[in-house]
Amino acid sequence: MKRKLSWMCAAVIGLSAFPAFMTAAAPAMPPLINAEPTEPAQSPVTEAPVVAQTAPSREVKLTFAQIAPPPGSMALRGVNPNGGIEFGMRSDEVASKAVLNLEYTPSPSLLPVQSQLKVYLNDELMGVLPVTKEQLGKKTLAQVPINPLFITDFNRVRLEFVGHYRDVCENPASSTLWLDIGRNSALDLTYNMLAVNNDLSHFPVPFFDPRDNRPVTLPIVFADMPDLAQQQAASIVASWFGSRAGWRGQRFPVLYNHLPDRNAIVFATNDRRPDFLRDHPAVNAPVIEMMNHPDNPYVKLLVVFGRDDKDLLQAAKGIAQGNILFRGSSVVVNDVKPLLARKPYDAPNWVRTDRPVTFGELKTYEEQLQSSGLEPAPINVSLNLPPDLYLLRSNGIDMDLNYRYTSPPTKDSSRLDISLNNQFLQAFSLNSTQETNRLLLRLPVLQGLLDGKTDVSIPALKLGAMNQLRFDFRYMNPMPGGSVDNCITFQPVPNHVVIGDDSTIDFSKYYHFIAMPDLRAFANAGFPFSRMADLSDTLAVMPKTPTEAQMETLLNTVGAIGGQTGFPAINLTITDDSAQIADKDADLLIIGAIPGKLKDDKRIDLLVQATQSWVKTPMRQTAFPSIMPDEADRAADAQSTVTASGPMAAVVGFQSPFNDQRSVIALLADSPRGYQLLNDAVNDSGKRAAMFGSVAVIRESGVHSLRVGDIYYVGHLPWFERLWYALANHPVLLAVLAALSVVLLAWVLWRLLRILSRRRLDPDHE
């Protein structure tokens, strides 16, 4: 009887658990084919974490086009079955819901059911999508619920393809084994905000969170129109946050006596403070305080207090250089003393040019220089260089490469391919005995390569401000074979490859010399201002009454330069007095309007004034900027004057009239909308890439650049290098000079031989 009761209880419990089991197995249901995804049923294991009911939430859609490796789509193959995306979660938020919406197409040759797509989150299996007969060769839409309890600060979604095209004697490298993931696939997330204590020990969180991959948007609030000292303090803080944001990008909207509905930085003194701080006690030292937004406790404000503007500057430098000591809800910045002066070209984000650099110094994460798999993924190393590095007559760049790899089982065509900026450099065989795994290379740069069998010239390699050095280890993997009756199969073993941290690359033998104006150098590297990482050689010229849009342009610009150099602009000088321009040996950054002393139409090729504008266009405009632009091509061909009602902005570069080695970059706009276009261009990497030459015109349609006007040179070259540079663009003149040199040398030798012959034949000569 007890046994019967036990069986009955087990049956009842099993039936009660059956619906939950079916719900939990929802991800494994066949996906929809050419249909919109349906909302999956929620299982008990995917319940949201407990948060306050009043906590604000936000919904995020992360498409594969945004977060997957370029181009956003994934091609999963038999020998390379894994693909994935990565995303972070802010420390002041918690995920309450997550759904992966996949768009994929399986090969029509796959065996149904035996072939499948597995979805992992942080190596936890979230769901399995079997490939059905109806899906073969067709675009398929599927939803996979993600358990939010497994979402952490940093997350990796891995897609693993298990493919079979026959029951026996399969070849994993068969071209019929594939499954393509579309770039429209997306991860839908719902985040709830958490109440955060006012504790600066976590600074810069929540104002900047390294786990957040989105561009940093951090409003800056002033009591009213800021004076020069407040502008400088805000620039220091903005550039420091820009240096932390790095590749994410940054934006600093400016507000006068108005609080945004998000985390923000507030500047206030005892005499000048926003209205919401009117009851705050006066301070007697530079103070940095974290407090709640008066209308929303989930929003935090970082208030930079001071008795006067001098205190604000000290507090700003404390944020930039002493934040590691922050703790509690407020700190007092007693003193900030510079110990060592910055040197030219010592930006932390740039490759050192004073000595050889190890690859270990170039790493940005721990496992960057290693890879594994039947076909190991490429190893990439970023090289951010000063844009004025002179490489025209260089024989190459010295690189001492130390690498390790899994030996090929036989002597075959396995090799290591080295590429720079997607252009092939050299290939080296991977020996089965590993007799040699250290290479002394010289990477050819800007000299051209000749194919050994034809007269076709391979395009010369060019190093820019941002470069990618790629190492591809390509293995010729032996695969099983045989017939159905006599099949040979084995389990493939992944290959492992490592580039040694002690490998070096040397840029220390090159001069600094560049043809200016070059807006590409400014857009991609902040040059010439970034030559000194702390902007100590930069003078920013602001209007006497800057608007919010003009202040935002200043902060966005110094923030972008900070992101490119990795160092804050602690020594930037700002002025609104054009009389000080001539007395300062510095590069000029002009916001708003060009001062009268610089208005010389021989130097400036674009002026934006109200709704009227004029521009000089060059005689010949090429699709890509030349390394050595021809003087005839850049001569002004026509001047057009246009009056229009639409907004326009411009970035203009020209030589300083006060110093031949100094440059002027002017950021101009004709209206508030024009400044919005200008700020969008400064913060958009795609629009920055379209800037080159001396003038970049920004309209609603995009960015159009011109190289027009005089070219000048910044830097130093020895006289013989300068001579070669001058003659490099004039081959006929070079040939004439070479011929004259040969004739002159021949004449000197002839005269010398005549003298020697005369002496030898002279009987009176002893």
UniProtKB/Swiss-Prot annotation:
Cytoplasmic side: 751-766
GO cellular component: plasma membrane
Membrane topology listed for this record: Single-pass type I membrane protein
Keyword Transmembrane helix in annotation: yes
GO annotation terms (biological process): cellulose biosynthetic process; UDP-alpha-D-glucose metabolic process
Name of the protein in question: Cyclic di-GMP-binding protein
Region forming the signal peptide: 1-35
Family: Belongs to the AcsB/BcsB family.
Superkingdom of the source species: Bacteria
Iron-sulfur as UniProt keyword: no
Gene this chain is encoded by: bcsB
Oligomer status and interactors: Tightly associated with the cellulose synthase catalytic subunit.
Residues annotated as transmembrane: 730-750
Membrane topology (Periplasmic): 36-729
InterPro entries with a match to the protein in the record: Cell_synth_B, Cell_synthase_bac
Key words of the record: c-di-GMP, Cell inner membrane, Cell membrane, Cellulose biosynthesis, Membrane, Signal, Transmembrane, Transmembrane helix
Compartment list: Cell inner membrane
Pathway participation: Glycan metabolism; bacterial cellulose biosynthesis
Taxonomic source organism: Salmonella typhi
Purpose of the protein: Binds the cellulose synthase activator, bis-(3'-5') cyclic diguanylic acid (c-di-GMP).
Main localization of the protein described in the UniProt heading: membrane
